[in-house]
Amino acid sequence: MTIGIIGAMEEEVELLKNTMPHVEEVVIGGAKFYVGEIAGKEVVLLESGIGKVNAAIGTTLLADRFKPEIIINTGSAGGMAEGLAVGDVIISDRLAYGDVDVTEFGYTYGQVPRMPAFYQGDAVLLKKAETIYRDYFSQSENKAVYGLVITNDSFIMRPDQHELIRTFFPDVKAVEMEAAAIAQVAYQFDIPFLIIRAISDLANQEATISFDEFIHLAAKQSATCIIELLKTI
C-alpha cells in the first residue's frame, strides 16, 4: 500500500521527511515529492505549495503518477470554534469551500457546480483516528476535535471574514487554504482521504503573529498525529 501525505509548506512536511531513512526526491511542475517509508509504510510525501490551485495540481500529480491508496493532508489551520487553542488538532469529517458562490444557479454556498456541497473524510480512517487520539491526547494539554473545515484562498483574520464564514457555516471548526481542494481531487479519483491539521492561530487579528510563532509547533503536532495513525494502517 502506498500512502500519499500532503503538506503545503516546507515547515509542514520537514519533520515527516526527516523520519524517512531513505528518500528519493522528484520535482514535477514545482511540486516536490519525497518517496520513502514512514513508520514502515510506503509513503509519497508531497510539498504542494500554498493555496487551492497548488494543492489541486499537486494532488492530481500524486494520484496520477504515484497511485496512492490513501491520501492524508497535514499542516496548520486557524481555529474558529470556541475553546480551541494553539496546538489542538482538528480532524475533518467534512470540508467545503468558503469562497465559492454559485447560489444563483441553485447550488449551496461553497459548492462547486456538479460537485458535492461537502467532501466527507473517509469513515474508516476517521474511526481509526478517533480511537488513536483518544489515548494519545489523554495525557496532553491539547485535544483532538472533529468537524467541519473550510478552505479559502485567503488568510482568515478579519471580523468581516469571520462573519461571512459563520453565516454560511455556523458549525465551522477551523479554516485553512488547501484541504477542500485536496479533498475534491481525492473524491474525483475515488481515493479515501483524511485531513489532520493542528491549530497555529485563532484566525483573529493576532493571527499573523501567532502563525509565525507557532507554525513549527503546529507542524510538529500534526506530523506526530500522522505518524501515530500510520502505525495502525
From Swiss-Prot:
The record's GO molecular-function terms, alphabetically, read: adenosylhomocysteine nucleosidase activity; methylthioadenosine nucleosidase activity
Keyword Hydrolase, does the record have it? Answer: yes
List keywords of the entry alphabetically: Amino-acid biosynthesis, Hydrolase, Methionine biosynthesis
Amino-acid biosynthesis as a keyword of this entry, yes or no, is yes
User: What sort of enzyme, by top EC class, is this?
Assistant: hydrolase
What is the reaction catalyzed?
S-adenosyl-L-homocysteine + H2O = S-(5-deoxy-D-ribos-5-yl)-L-homocysteine + adenine; S-methyl-5'-thioadenosine + H2O = 5-(methylsulfanyl)-D-ribose + adenine; 5'-deoxyadenosine + H2O = 5-deoxy-D-ribose + adenine
Q: Name one GO biological process term.
A: L-methionine salvage from methylthioadenosine
Quote the record's binding site residues for substrate: G78, I156, M177, E178
Which GO cellular component terms, listed alphabetically, does the Swiss-Prot or TrEMBL entry include? cytosol
**What pathway, per the record?**
Amino-acid biosynthesis; L-methionine biosynthesis via salvage pathway; S-methyl-5-thio-alpha-D-ribose 1-phosphate from S-methyl-5'-thioadenosine (hydrolase route): step 1/2
Q: What is its EC number?
A: 3.2.2.9
Q: Which InterPro entries match?
A: MTA_SAH_Nsdase (IPR010049), Nucleoside_phosphorylase_d (IPR000845), Nucleoside_phosphorylase_sf (IPR035994)
Q: Name one Pfam family in it.
A: PNP_UDP_1
List the catalytic residues: E12 (proton acceptor), D201 (proton donor)
Q: Please explain the role this protein plays, according to its UniProt record.
A: Catalyzes the irreversible cleavage of the glycosidic bond in both 5'-methylthioadenosine (MTA) and S-adenosylhomocysteine (SAH/AdoHcy) to adenine and the corresponding thioribose, 5'-methylthioribose and S-ribosylhomocysteine, respectively. Also cleaves 5'-deoxyadenosine, a toxic by-product of radical S-adenosylmethionine (SAM) enzymes, into 5-deoxyribose and adenine.
Q: Which family does it belong to?
A: Belongs to the PNP/UDP phosphorylase family. MtnN subfamily.
Full protein name: 5'-methylthioadenosine/S-adenosylhomocysteine nucleosidase
Gene designation: mtnN
